[in-house]
Amino acid sequence: MQQLIDNLKKRGILDNSSAGLESLTVPVSAYLGFDPTAPSLHIGHWIGICFLRRLAAYGITPVALVGGATGMIGDPSGKSVERSLLDQAQVLDNSKKIAAALASYLPGIRIVNNADWLGSLSMVDFLRDVGKHFRLGSMLAKDVVKQRVYSEEGISYTEFSYLLLQSYDFAHLFKEHNVVLQCGGSDQWGNITSGIDYIRRRGLGQAYGLTYPLLTDSKGKKIGKTESGTIWLDPALTPPYELFQYFLRLPDQEISKVMRTLTLLDNEEIFALDERLTSDPQAVKKYIAEVIVKDVHGSEGLAQAQAATESFFASKGKSITEAELVALVESGVGVKVARADLIGKRWLDIVVELGFCSSRGQARRLIQQRGLYINQEPLADEQSILDGTQLCFDRYVLLSQGKRKKQVIDLN
């Protein structure tokens, strides 16, 4: 364990750890949780997936927990307002998809679902056997609770109970699967230490915790969000091209944190890339984008992203071919719409309807600034409509927002 701790410190991704953790000897097991609050994992989850892979490389047996029960409650950590509760059917469906994704990214890993033990726990048993081990004073002192209790939004008893449920998870895995270490982002430290204390109070033994820094920008906002929404790992929600472009567009100062947390590149290569950032940041970002897209979507996904990039950003004067447009649509960088649904509509309405612009206000500003392009020509009139003369090969339209954001409309 000491080697892992040293590596994480050197890499700069060790946030907090329990006293005595470095003295643990392998083999040991460690777990990390993924709540199924959506049908897909997002780029923030990739930090945890990389972390589990890193644990395995050091001889630690990784366990992934899908929060089929806790996902119905909602973790208040890092949230200023309460999450909207999902219905049971949605959580069940999300859980299956998250488990399948984890199995594909982490072949052979043990995947557990806390609905298997929390789902059958009665309220009376929970209060009697779990609640009695927790003191309100220490719970209220936790940062995540303290921040919400005194906020205008407050915190519900439902969210307040999340800490107890996560602690019970840790104790269950400790007892049933000999999992002695829980890992997570820095916002999970309070929940993790509560679990360690709960395990001790029950007389089960000594447990440990370890956290890594959250991936945030210079303003403290979590990386992985765009104006269009979340960056998902499911290629049907965020195509490989969009994932690739996301990392190319990141500010230069953010890429150093990205390559430490979202890749398994060794520390020596990371430090060499740090030096290269000062002289050729775009080349470093391109390389890191390639590494991550290949890791998430495989060689085929990377090839799609590269081909789409080549098609969209071809040298000036080079026309995009029909084959390239077809490939872009098939790779997810496009949307198929019935011709009758769009012909004759204003572009101002179309770009909002397709989610290419967040609002008509944004679309108007882009048009006024000559930043919205139809087939590589700036749209000058907000009253302009889509007609048959704008179709490439009598079927396609290439939308562009500035230099980076692109989309193909396939009027099939």
Swiss-Prot record:
A motif ('HIGH' region) lies at residues 36-45. Coiled coil: none annotated. L-tyrosine binds at residues 31, 162, 166. Transmembrane segments: none annotated. InterPro entries: aa-tRNA-synth_Ic, Rossmann-like_a/b/a_fold, S4_RNA-bd, S4_RNA-bd_sf, Tyr-tRNA-ligase, Tyr-tRNA-ligase_bac-type, Tyr-tRNA-ligase_bac_1. SMART domains: S4. This is Tyrosine--tRNA ligase. It comes from Chlamydia trachomatis serovar D (strain ATCC VR-885 / DSM 19411 / UW-3/Cx).
